[in-house]
Amino acid sequence: MYTKADAAYIPFAWMNPELAVILPVYAGDHPDYLREALESIVRQSLQNFILVVVEDGPLPEAITQVLNEYKDEMQLLQHSQNQGLATALNTALDWCEQYKISFLARMDADDRMRPERLEMQLDFLNLHEEVDVVGCALEEMDTQGRPRGKQVFYPENHHECLRFFRFRDPLPHPGVMFRMRFFQKAGRYDPGLRYNQDTELWYRGFLNGAVFANLPAVLLEFRMTEAFFATRRAGKARARQLLALRKEINKGLGFGPEARLFARGMFLLALLPAGIRKLAYRIFR
């Protein structure tokens, strides 16, 4: 939970927004990528929203300068020390709940939104009252922001999202929009998890009756870097945590032997060199 000492407040009551975009930032982010992310947010076709940025610990001057360029566009919350992604997201959720925000869009500091993303997702949720969280398709881009020639689509309805979850996450975490009630059903992000916080959140969502959906439109430009392949589900600690989580998911949601076999395969893949993981990602993404 943040305190007034940890947060910089701006007056926004006149806006009366129902939607917030949540953007965590930490020292490891790239300032140029962050600028692109922020620019894509402020240029949305839908303008009645508030941007909530969480500074997760001390930041380099280059990142601070980028944030200062957009200081009039955001609500800034600050952690005096780095506390991790889950805690940063929970800080934003607590603030949004306090100010009775109804819808929350996720965004990462190295990706870009298509201009129509917020408008399309909010329109969808307003038309489908039963849905608690909606994702979208994404297009991969390289470190220079150029298309890599690959688009990724996710299941559109709840039933197919649940089936898809036997093997992979059914939504792109930086491309989702939640109703606040999703977190009333599923709870907050687990700060005790160093990895796979989104996977664990989806599990609790399914377990507690949240309804999932995806739009078949490319609304997120997802940046692929060598660091992404080097760290994605890599290392023994991450592999063990993922395997344990997948075992819990398979048991809790009643997934069959094919899901258990896939979980073991993911565990072994995480122990292989980055080059092999990169090849597997390109094949199975």
Describe these PLM feature segments.
Residues Y2-A234:
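Nucleotide-sugar donor-binding/catalytic module of glycosyltransferases
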Residues A230-R285:
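Non-catalytic, C-terminal membrane-associated alpha-helical segments of glycosyltransferases
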